[in-house]
Amino acid sequence: VSEQSEFPDGQYPERPVERHKGPVVLRRDRRDQGSTTDQRLLDSRGPSDWVHTDPWRVLRIQAEFVEGFGALAEVPRAVTVFGSARTKRDHPEYELGRKIGAALADAGFAVMTGGGPGAMEAVNRGANEAGGFSVGLGIELPFEQGLNPWVDLGVNFRYFFARKTMFVKYSQAFICLPGGFGTLDELFEALTLVQTKKVTKFPVVLFGTEYWGGLYDWIAKSVLGGGKIGEKDLDLLHLTDDIDDAVRVVQESYQAWEDTH
């Protein structure tokens, strides 16, 4: 369509008043902040609250991804193990975590955890004591204690979503020990990513039938039974109490992946 047909008699709409802020165009009544980008950057007398604005946060988020990718790019094949930060060192689940970490190390896998205390520490410790490679991806929290001493390679994150990307990208499998909301968050995100084929299928092991059995039964009865997922979706979960069985599932899945790549 020609301009003449859109605007007969040569009557064109008046060009709106506009201001430019870098690549952003402000037109009509869009308010300007009254200064240029360079001025706000170079003027040391100005306010410093600009570092807390959303555009600046984007750069910080980008930096987290760059730092995470750079730090983890050379990590050997790894398995992420989730579990509660509240697990005490004298609790049976702590010793279980140590054994799982050691078993994964013996099988040639690096272990990756959230890097915190409790079950995470136990897994890192077990892998470290067995001579394996132990990775911790920490998160900035008001009550965070920092990375546990059994981490060989640690990366701290401000943002959960950047950290979760690293867990998925650099893991061959997830093993979930008894845990709280954080463990559940990671569990269901992994299931969703695999179900929707956003990531290559990898196993999600629920370790501890007494703890996870109720959740598994609810998914089978209510979620699958109600037609909210397909039958194959339930197969994404493997429920076990046996360390050798958990490691076997991980090894078989990794071997199947290797055979196709």
Predicted segments with their positions:
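C-terminal functional extensions of proteins
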Residues: 206-261
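Short gly/pro/ser/thr-enriched loop/turn and capping motifs at secondary-structure boundaries
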Residues: 141-146, 183, 211-214
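Glycine-rich beta-alpha loop segments
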Residues: 2-137
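Structural motif
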Residues: 77-80, 109-110, 132-136, 152-154, ...
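Catalytic-core regions of core metabolic enzymes
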Residues: 51, 55-58, 203, 208-211
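Solvent-exposed alpha-helices and their adjacent loops that cap or buttress functional pockets
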Residues: 72-74, 103-105, 127-128, 145-149, ...
